[in-house]
């Protein structure tokens, strides 16, 4: 469902943000 896709994209964005936060700098 489109709603499910939105959650998947949101999860990817958050996951990438966490990865950058802990592995960046």
UniProtKB/Swiss-Prot annotation:
MF GO annotations: metal ion binding; peptidase activity; toxin activity
Cofactor needs: Zn(2+)
GO BP of this protein: proteolysis
Cofactor note: Binds 1 zinc ion per subunit.
Miscellaneous comment in the UniProt entry for this protein: Acidic protein of about 24 kDa.
Function: Metalloprotease that is highly active against alpha-(FGA) and beta-chains (FGB) of fibrinogen molecules.
Protein's UniProt name: Snake venom metalloproteinase catroxase
Native source organism of the sequence: Crotalus atrox
Highest classification ranks of the organism: Eukaryota, Metazoa, Chordata, Craniata, Vertebrata
């Amino acid at each position: 469902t489109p709603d499910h896709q939105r959650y998947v994209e949101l999860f990817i964005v958050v996951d990438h943000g966490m990865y950058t936060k802990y592995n960046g700098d």
